Amino acid sequence: MLHAKIVDIKEKKISLSDAEKFISSNSYGASIFFTGTVRNQNNNKNVVGITYDSHDALVIKSFQEIYNEAEKKLNIDVKSVFIEHAKGYLNLGEISIVIAVACKHRDKTYLLSRYIIEEIKKRSPIWKKEHYLNNKTSWLKGNPIINEKN
């Protein structure tokens, strides 16, 4: 079971209670919540906020592909996964992503949660523009949408 969504923060904030409700079930003995938040330092620069942009349809597709791949690669057939990523400007400490995972056992839950966040960072077309204390901004280097072959 998968919930995958891009959240426009002008309309709604990411909700941990929504994640908890989605993954709650008597079928699962373990659950994990991963939250990514805006931190105040990156590459020795004082960050005050981040603007996230994304290609929403491709992001959702990548979330679904990652979920489906995980089932095969990690051999986890009974699971519930909730993924939401913010789009728009976030202040320090605000949640940019939540990944909630529930499985029968804790080992698979940890494994699946880690797999999902690492694959999202590698593959999902989500871009970050950092806003600094000195009023400057910078788009961070991301990954290409299409894998280039040499």
Feature annotation, model-predicted:
Residues 1-95, 102-114, 118-150:
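N-terminal, polar/charged subdomain of small-to-medium soluble alpha/beta proteins
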